[in-house]
């Protein structure tokens, strides 16, 4: 049975940013995995980068519409090919925040947030999908304390956290924990 991994890039990046990671995960997992890298809908102040919503200053009022728009894109994608229940959402930084806000109220197989943060008024569904939260202890862009704000809002039996010695990045040593998570949520679904 086919599965899908949807990638959400961070603020100022493009959809190409996470594609090497997605290809690496797809090559290493022993099941068919389609990789889709979505581009944020808005231009970053310094093109060609993109943004899910304005961040400097933070436009928190735009978040609900951004989340709704992303959820509609995910629903459209899953009308063909792998279902929502066979889809994992993986986001980095602002993309991680969007993955959490959008994915935790959808019937996804799982959500992976890398160096993400909780949106101010985010309240995940009680029955949210399994979540993997990864964050660097030396992250100078999104402080590692953001991980606490995420885990406080999620059910502990549905959320796994990993902190690592690095900054605002996804280091190579995090690929294996991602693979383990993907295998668990996709083979069980």
What are these regions (language model features)?
Residues 55, 144-189:
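C-terminal catalytic histidine-bearing segment of alpha/beta-hydrolase fold enzymes
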Residues 118-128:
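Conserved serine/cysteine hydrolase catalytic core
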Residues 90-95, 99:
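Gly/Ala-rich beta-loop-alpha elbow adjacent to hydrolase catalytic centers
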Residues 107-118:
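A conserved short beta-strand
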């Amino acid at each position: 049975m086919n599965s899908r991994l949807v990638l959400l890039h961070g603020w100022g990046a493009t959809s190409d940013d996470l594609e090497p990671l997605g290809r690496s995960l797809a090559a290493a997992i022993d099941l068919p995995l389609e990789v889709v890298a979505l581009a944020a809908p808005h231009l970053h102040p310094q093109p060609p980068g993109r943004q899910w919503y304005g961040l400097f200053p933070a436009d928190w009022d735009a978040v609900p519409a951004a989340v709704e728009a992303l959820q509609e894109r995910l629903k459209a994608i899953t009308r063909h090919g792998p279902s929502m229940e066979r889809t994992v959402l993986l986001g980095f930084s602002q993309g991680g925040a969007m993955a959490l806000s959008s994915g935790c109220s959808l019937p996804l197989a799982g959500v992976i947030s890398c160096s993400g943060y909780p949106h101010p008024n985010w309240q995940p569904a009680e029955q949210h999908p399994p979540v993997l939260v990864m964050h660097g202890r030396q992250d100078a862009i999104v402080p590692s304390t953001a991980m606490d704000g995420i885990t406080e809002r999620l059910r502990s039996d549905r959320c796994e956290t990993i902190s690592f010695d690095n900054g605002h990045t996804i280091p190579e040593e995090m690929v294996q924990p991602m693979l383990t998570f993907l295998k668990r949520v996709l083979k069980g679904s």
